Amino acid sequence: KVEGHGTDIKISGGLQIEQNAPLSVSTIYDQTENGNGKAYVIDDEILMTSRKSVYQTLTEHEEYSRFLELLSGGDPDSTDYNLLTSQIDDKYSCVDQNIRLFETYNYTVYVPTNKAIEELHEKGVLPYWEDFDNATDPDARYRIKNRIVNFLRYHIQDNSVYIGDGSESGVKYETAKLNPANRRFYSVTVDKEGNDGMTVTDNLGRTRRVVTTEGLYNNMCREYAFDTGKNTIYTSSYAVVHLIDGALMYDEEQMEKYE
């Protein structure tokens, strides 16, 4: 993140944003006349990435709470399919909870508002995990679990996209939800408007806008996997979390009642 201009420039990495401690540029070497651009000198610490996982980021904002409840739940009889995990491949530990779908890459997590999720639940199209726990019929439990997990998967896309890093129109990104008909991942379409905002259009053609309330968008995250002694980083993934003003849907069947 870069703020200011001229000789008054402040730069922040993920860690500096978390700590609200931007770094000041002390000297600027301008070599543009020779075609080499500019070099910026920082006398303080180096730029660092975020230390917070997606899970920790979600826990710190009430506005993310309904999505977090869905992400944190799961089937106790098939934990390998739950989306949050504290251990990867039974040998790599996490700081707290990692998203199991992440694989040494960068991602975007779109979080619908609590109101949007609650409205879907009231309509009977998006169950909660308590509905799963209360169900006794195995087929019903299977339908409920799949409806929740697939809903979550469609809100996670490959590639981190931010408000403020330029403009782009009609760019498709794959999500983590697989289309069983063609064995390809469903996509979303992103339109970035520079510093003015960003919209996401789902597979049904409905457009959702990123909520640009301070602290609820562009939240940088990094998830680590350590060896069992927690002394060495085995791998890590980057992600950004945005609050959006409605849910994303990939299929009309999602709008049918699950019961």
Q: What is the meaning of each model-derived region?
A:
Residues 1-259:
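Mature, structured domains of secreted/extracytosolic soluble proteins
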